[in-house]
């Protein structure tokens, strides 16, 4: 066979060969290690299950979806490193980050490199207030959930003494500031307003002050590691105050740390999506893997569904900006948390929060 004949044969064979599809890779930036790894596990489980279910049905635009994990350990610097890895790997879409303190710096890195992120859990208002076009969420904001908590206190603890404590982070301080604004506007001024440092174990100075001030309600802006310890130390001091917080107290690790002292703690979280028929397929897929259909897990599942919808609307996974624009067309997107629509900021156009309570290691409705 001559070289000319061989070349012609190869060209002909390539012309009739089926085109190979490139995988669509979604990066997951989450705390897979560290003190808030429990949240990372929930988000990873939700996102991976959604990817698996999508692939069972043919993928996105006929292409297989792959989830690539990047551990941020709940630390902003490590989050930036994870974001740079995602960018270096040529990934255009990200689920996460999980915590607001990590999500804000990561969003800047991703924006500079044309990567679209959908966070299932980062609730700080500042995340979507900075004019970035590449940030969306499948959760509400801290100002929304803190307002729900403050109105609950104004209604049920009128004329009682309130303390506000935060962990100095974007999430915790954001919650505390928003809670204070609504509380003060409603006529209650807190008697204690203090902060703790994540990683600290001894809150004796704070708990002693709370007891001496005869505080009835402690609003805590922060996550479960410190929240559980605070509950236990208040209980040990016989400071009979009700703890109220945000969705950072929704994890079972909060109960594991606080044990019985965590009983009666009230927290805000997204209204129960499992009550909607929209969540059934996701809940069934999770149940098949023995994974509870918890709020953060369903939010992560929904984040993958949002990316799928955006890519299909745009007709391609090549341009993340085009996908982001397509998602903000005002049309409903069916997800595991219900039908969602997005405004120009990347926030959900509607999001409801409910109040829950810890009782004997179980989460029940607070009202």
From Swiss-Prot:
It is found in: Periplasm. It comes from the Bacteria. Keywords: Amino-acid transport, Periplasm, Signal, Transport. SUPFAM superfamilies: Periplasmic binding protein-like I. InterPro entries: Leu-bd, Leu_Ile_Val-bd, Peripla_BP_I. Its main location: periplasm. The keyword Transport applies. The keyword Signal applies. GO terms for cellular component: ATP-binding cassette (ABC) transporter complex, substrate-binding subunit-containing; periplasmic space. Disruption phenotype: Reduced uptake of amino acids Glu, Asp, Ala, Leu, Ile and Val by bacteroids that lack this gene and the genes aapJ and braC from the two ABC uptake systems of branched-chain amino acids. Pea plants inoculated with the triple mutant bacteroids are defective in symbiosis; the plants are yellow, have increased numbers of small pale pink root nodules, dry weights similar to uninoculated control plants and 30% acetylene reduction compared to plants inoculated with wild-type bacteroids. Residues 1-22 form the signal peptide. Transmembrane segments: none annotated. One of its GO terms (biological process) is amino acid import. Belongs to the leucine-binding protein family. The complex is composed of two ATP-binding proteins (BraF and BraG), two transmembrane proteins (BraD and BraE) and a solute-binding protein (BraC or BraC3). Part of the ABC transporter complex BraDEFGC/C3 involved in transport of branched-chain amino acids Leu, Ile and Val (LIV). Essential for the development of bacteroids, the differentiated legume-symbiotic forms of this bacterium, and for the effective N(2) fixation by them. This is Leu/Ile/Val-binding protein BraC3. It comes from Rhizobium johnstonii (strain DSM 114642 / LMG 32736 / 3841) (Rhizobium leguminosarum bv. viciae).
């Amino acid at each position: 066979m001559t070289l000319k004949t061989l070349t012609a044969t190869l060209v002909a064979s390539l012309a009739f060969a089926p085109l190979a599809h490139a995988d669509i890779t979604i990066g997951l930036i989450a705390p897979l290690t560290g003190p808030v790894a429990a949240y990372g596990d929930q988000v990873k489980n939700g996102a991976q299950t959604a990817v698996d279910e999508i692939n069972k049905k043919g993928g996105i635009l006929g292409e297989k979806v792959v989830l690539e994990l990047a551990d941020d350990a709940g630390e902003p610097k490590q989050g930036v490193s994870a974001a740079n890895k995602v960018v270096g790997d040529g990934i255009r879409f990200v689920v996460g980050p999980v915590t607001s303190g990590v999500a804000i710096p990561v969003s800047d890195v991703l924006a500079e490199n044309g990567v679209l992120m959908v966070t299932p859990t980062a609730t700080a208002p500042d995340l979507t207030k900075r004019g970035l076009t590449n940030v969306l969420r499948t959760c509400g904001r801290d100002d929304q959930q803190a307002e729900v908590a403050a109105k609950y206190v104004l209604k049920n603890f009128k004329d009682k003494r309130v303390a506000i404590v935060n962990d100095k982070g974007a999430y915790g301080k954001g919650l505390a500031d928003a809670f204070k604004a609504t509380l003060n506007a409603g006529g209650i001024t807190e008697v204690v307003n203090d902060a703790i440092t994540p990683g600290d174990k001894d809150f004796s100075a704070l708990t002693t002050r709370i007891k001496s001030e005869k505080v009835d309600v402690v609003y805590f802006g922060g996550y479960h590691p410190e929240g559980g310890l605070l509950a236990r130390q208040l209980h040990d001091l016989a400071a009979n105050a009700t703890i109220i917080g945000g969705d950072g107290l929704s994890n079972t690790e909060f109960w594991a740390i606080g044990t019985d002292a965590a009983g009666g703690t009230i927290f805000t979280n997204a209204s129960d999506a499992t009550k909607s028929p929209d969540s059934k397929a996701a809940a069934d897929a999770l149940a098949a893997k023995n994974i509870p259909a918890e709020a953060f897990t369903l939010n992560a599942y929904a984040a993958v569904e949002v990316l799928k919808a955006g890519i299909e609307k745009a007709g391609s996974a090549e341009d993340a900006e085009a996908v982001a624009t397509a998602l903000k067309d005002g049309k409903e997107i069916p997800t595991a948390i219900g039908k969602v629509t997005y405004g120009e900021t990347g926030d959900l156009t509607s999001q409801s929060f409910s109040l829950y309570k810890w009782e004997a290691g179980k989460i029940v409705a607070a009202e």
